[in-house]
Amino acid sequence: MELNTHNAEILLSAANKSHYPQDELPEIALAGRSNVGKSSFINTMLNRKNLARTSGKPGKTQLLNFFNIDDKMRFVDVPGYGYARVSKKEREKWGRMIEEYLTTRENLRAVVSLVDLRHDPSADDVQMYEFLKYYEIPVIIVATKADKIPRGKWNKHESAIKKKLNFDPSDDFILFSSVSKEGMDEAWDAILEKL
């Protein structure tokens, strides 16, 4: 599939099924804990500065945000999880919204699960990965902020993350940096393969 990634726009924000786009376009969902770099990932992948708003305040995305890419596919930005300052009730509401989308959306082709290369995956990261494996949803692990770690230590951090996730070697694992654009081509290859 040839994609003009410059031709991208935010299409709509949805709180539930009735608001989802009603067509056949394939979707790739992006999930990860708050401030893992999801907005930066979207902006880097689509060669845009601020299509997805980056925020110093975690927990800003509270709806599913659908991004139209060249009228051929969509990114779906899922609310960041694991943000402490959001009430338990809010978190449960998000949880249900995310679960409904991930388990019932026929357009969904795969989930890009973002983790921070600098740290061990959180319990939420592990739970998300297990959830995706349980429902047999294709998953691409993208380890963000690779530029913050010396290249010589990447392998060590990658191994630690894979071990904690109980990573399935048949899944893609991509080291990514929105600063250096490391892993961008690899991420696109993995995504397009799932469409």
Curated annotation (Swiss-Prot):
Protein residues bound to Mg(2+): 39, 61
Domain EngB-type G: from-to ranges: 24-195
Residues given in the record as GTP binding sites: 32-39, 59-63, 77-80, 144-147, 176-178
InterPro entries xrefs: G_ENGB_dom, GTP-bd, GTP-bd_ribosome_bio_YsxC, P-loop_NTPase
Alphabetized UniProt keyword annotations: Cell cycle, Cell division, GTP-binding, Magnesium, Metal-binding, Nucleotide-binding, Septation
An annotated GO BP: division septum assembly
Obligatory cofactor(s): Mg(2+)
GO MF term set: GTP binding; metal ion binding
This protein's GO CC annotations: cytosol
Top-rank taxon: Bacteria
Family membership: Belongs to the TRAFAC class TrmE-Era-EngA-EngB-Septin-like GTPase superfamily. EngB GTPase family.
Role this protein plays: Necessary for normal cell division and for the maintenance of normal septation.
HAMAP family xrefs: GTPase_EngB (MF_00321)
Name assigned to this protein: Probable GTP-binding protein EngB
